[in-house]
A protein has these predicted regions:
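Alpha-helical assembly-interface signal, strongest on the long, hydrophobic N-terminal helix that forms
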Residues: 1-77
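Short secondary-structure transition/capping segments
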Residues: 5-10, 98-106, 140-149
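Residue-level marker of positions within ordered structural domains that often coincide
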Residues: 50, 87, 119-121, 147
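Soluble periplasmic/extracytoplasmic beta-strand elements of cell-envelope proteins
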Residues: 51, 113-117, 139-145
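Short amphipathic secondary-structure patches
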Residues: 51-115
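Low-complexity, S/T/G/P-rich flexible repeat/linker segments used as non-globular hinges
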Residues: 122-149
Length: 149
């Protein structure tokens, strides 16, 4: 019985498929980590928006008075409430490059708009994801409004 000339080719195929599988695992783990970190950042933004929606701007309240059914907010009161909340929950230490963005404020004097940004860390960095070794930039926005009865 004569042996074929293509003996040993199966090993090459196994190595190629194993490499592809490892790269696929790296990409899936990285995408999952980014998704989870984005959801955590969005949860902080939601909670900060809820907290900021109750941050009454006393200058507006006592100066011009409140409109019926609305808590008077200002960019300054929302920004201060969000920064205080972020420090209180430890968001600055939990997220890499955490920032409260300039879009944070009150666009209409009634709604608290919170925009946060951070970088998601990738647990596995390979040749495929090497471009994101410093992390993936994330930006989230949440809005909340408090209505008075």
């Amino acid at each position: 019985m004569k042996r074929d000339d293509d003996s040993g080719q199966v090993l090459l195929l196994i190595v190629a498929y194993a490499s592809i599988a490892l790269l696929l695992v790296t990409v899936v783990v990285g995408a999952s980590a980014v998704h989870v970190e984005r959801k955590q950042l969005l949860a902080v933004a939601d909670a900060a928006a809820l907290d900021a929606a109750d941050a009454v701007d006393t200058d507006v309240l006592y100066g011009t008075g409140a409109r019926p059914g609305a808590v008077p907010l200002s960019d300054r009161s929302v920004q201060a409430a969000v920064e205080d909340y972020a420090v209180a929950v430890g968001a600055t230490g939990r997220f890499q490059d955490f920032r409260v963005e300039g879009a944070t404020g009150s666009p209409d004097g009634r709604t608290a708009q919170v925009t946060l940004s951070a970088r998601a860390r990738l647990p596995l960095v390979s040749a495929v994801l090497g471009e994101y070794a410093a992390g993936v930039p994330l930006t989230v926005t949440a809005r909340a409004r408090t209505n008075l009865g």
